[in-house]
Amino acid sequence: MLKTINPTQTQAWNALTAHFESAQDMDLKDLFAQDAARFDKFSARFGSDILVDYSKNLINEETLKHLFALAKETELSAAIKAMFSGEAINQTEGRAVLHTALRNRSNQPVLVDGEDVMPAVNAVLEKMKSFTDRVIGGEWKGYTGKAITDIVNIGIGGSDLGPYMVTEALAPYKNHLNLHFVSNVDGTHIVETLKKVDPETTLFLIASKTFTTQETMTNAHTARDWFLATAGDQAHVAKHFAALSTNAPAVSEFGIDTDNMFEFWDWVGGRYSLWSAIGLSIALAVGYDNFVELLEGAHEMDNHFVSTELESNIPVILALIGIWYNNFHGAESEAILPYDQYMHRFAAYFQQGNMESNGKYVDRNGNPVTYQTGPIIWGEPGTNGQHAFYQLIHQGTKLIPCDFIAPAVSHNPAGDHHQKLMSNFFAQTEALAFGKNEATVKAELVKAGKNAEEVAAIAPFKVFEGNRPTNSILVKQITPRTLGNLIAMYEHKIFVQGVIWNIFSFDQWGVELGKQLANQILPELADDSEISSHDSSTNGLINAFKAFKA
């Protein structure tokens, strides 16, 4: 079990609090000027394909010393061991947390309640391989004998965000199959998707562990009705629908052959499920071998995380730096900024991964915390963000630590596009770190022919304070393996922060209340009778909705 240590009661936290008093005066220009080896000291390589530069952070060796001491005092190493050994660290649900077993390419036994889960994991992988080979190869036929051309994944949350993010990020590896993702219960999402596909050549993947998720099953029934409007015979459903689920009776009742049901387990959290059968859409999009490469990449990062001392452990370093900003500098958000258009959903994926995991105000003792926990995560691809929100990062009043991610090698080396992209990648972190002082601004204005009065009027608005912290994550190329590295790196960063904050990162009770109330309200929307059972605001909104519809 995880320890229940209040981080603010540790010696390291007190030391960090004292250190922060002097650290507020840190200036990145001075830190780099004083230490020619700063980049070498504050960067790390993962294998031969990833470089993580954290030198442009408001830290020095003393900062890191206290942060590593905090990790040790909160018994992080024991927590890592507990997770990987299958202990039920998701204590509020009584479950192990073993998404790492899904990508355990070593096949070393992983025990849950004394039973090795690896044979079951490998059996599902073999089933996925056979299925994807048949569909991709054209052997799997629809009800009219035609090969499948389109895959529609119907899921929500972890059953959608992860597969969608990965299939987009790995688009250069795609085969001939067209992938579509439907998540929102808004009928527009399924209706617009169905306009693009042919019932004779479409395969639907229904991704719901329980096969009861409201949004997913509503969309699934709409898809089935649409399909049967053309196909007619209920028996044809089996050729066009597969299930990613554990509820065999419900799957069978829907009309899906349970031979085409791919199971996963309660020790797989939704936001960590792309490594499981939920990743079937990924395997169909890029081929099973590339899906295995994705697993291999994550497994490599798992090995690094488990076996590397804290001081050289990349997810640990990133997590601790995040805590430094979140809990001492008062930063409320972090931006993830991939300079790769294929990775346009990466920030959204980790928005769920981080905020659903660590958006908690109750500690592992069941008490309200007295300190900040999970940050707000957001971001967009560069260079788009530069023309949207970077203004606030550069010159706003909020401290927003940023992760910049970019590949050295583009999948689309058109003209000088990639050099221009990368020049922006390098320039932004330099500008954020070092800014532009008033003397430089004034000199530039004078050189541009401005008179003294104009210089005095304009100069204040063109000053950049700098000291905006960033991490730069440079990847040789985005491949299935390096993408697996990156995803696992961020997963483990989130875990480390949750351990230190003394919260449970693998439940998500915060999504339940809204669901319960929606189920109560749904029957109230069935007719035009006036509602008075809620607060005045909710009553007013429901009654206005009914009036608008009338």
From Swiss-Prot:
GO molecular function, one term: carbohydrate derivative binding
Localisation per UniProt entry: Cytoplasm
GO annotation terms (biological process): gluconeogenesis; glucose 6-phosphate metabolic process; glycolytic process
Keywords assigned: Cytoplasm, Gluconeogenesis, Glycolysis, Isomerase
Keyword Cytoplasm among UniProt keywords: yes
EC number: 5.3.1.9
Entry-linked InterPro entries: G6P_Isomerase, G6P_Isomerase_C, Phosphoglucose_isomerase_CS, SIS_dom_sf, SIS_PGI_1, SIS_PGI_2
GO cellular component: cytosol
UniProt-annotated catalytic positions: 356, 387, 515
Keyword Ubl conjugation tagged: no
Pathway: Carbohydrate biosynthesis; gluconeogenesis; Carbohydrate degradation; glycolysis; D-glyceraldehyde 3-phosphate and glycerone phosphate from D-glucose: step 2/4
Ranges in a coiled coil: none
Catalytic reactions on record: alpha-D-glucose 6-phosphate = beta-D-fructose 6-phosphate
PANTHER family named among the record's database cross-references: GLUCOSE-6-PHOSPHATE ISOMERASE (PTHR11469:SF1)
Biological role: Catalyzes the reversible isomerization of glucose-6-phosphate to fructose-6-phosphate.
Family: Belongs to the GPI family.
Stated name of the protein: Glucose-6-phosphate isomerase
Species annotation: Vibrio vulnificus (strain YJ016)
Lineage of the organism: Bacteria, Pseudomonadati, Pseudomonadota, Gammaproteobacteria, Vibrionales
